[in-house]
Amino acid sequence: MLDLQNLKICQGSFQLTASLCGLDAKIYAIMGPSGAGKSTFLAALAGFLPVSSGAVLWNGQNITGLRPAQRPMAMLFQDNNLFPHLSAERNVALALTQRRYLSSIRQEQVKAALLRVGLSGFEAHKPGELSGGQQSRVALARVLLQDKPILLLDEPFTALGPALKNEMLDLLQTLAQERQATVLMVTHDPNDALRIADETLLLSDQVLSPPQPTQQVMASPPKALAAYLGLD
């Protein structure tokens, strides 16, 4: 269970606060106006940016001071963060090791991850030889192989067309349910939230609000979200 206790994130003149309790094995969408700090929030949560005060707790343990690799979190970025000179197998294997040599056990783990995202037989392909959807699947396989209970997603499927994006969202939902993962997904598209998010958090006016049922939020969006969506 993820708790944020009076968390404050400062970057220059920008400031963001968040106090949340009891985020569990659900999919949470994070929405808000452009420039509200959604990506900054995820980066700080993952440990890539410092927090000014407050605490991040996982199952009651304070993890605020842990390095990114030590945290129970895996992050999927908008650009997939794949290395163009490495094969799909090697890109996924980076979740386990940076060494070039893979033991037979690790090779099987990588193959299993690629199989789970529908890319069996694509181990030798480099990112430039893959479609956008396939690249997203490679990145998702790498995240899955990290086997972390919290998944952080920063608009990972934005560059995909509607059909491919929905396919990836559905796959993400299935995998999250299988693993009982806590998923925080930044998105600018209300349809993404409606499709897979159990609850939605609004980030506006430098404050991250507590989650509410997604259907409820979209049926009667707060003023800031309504303005962002062009509904006011």
Question: Can you say where each PLM-predicted feature lies in the sequence?
Answer:
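Catalytic Walker B motif of ABC-type/P-loop ATPase nucleotide-binding domains
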Residues: 151-155
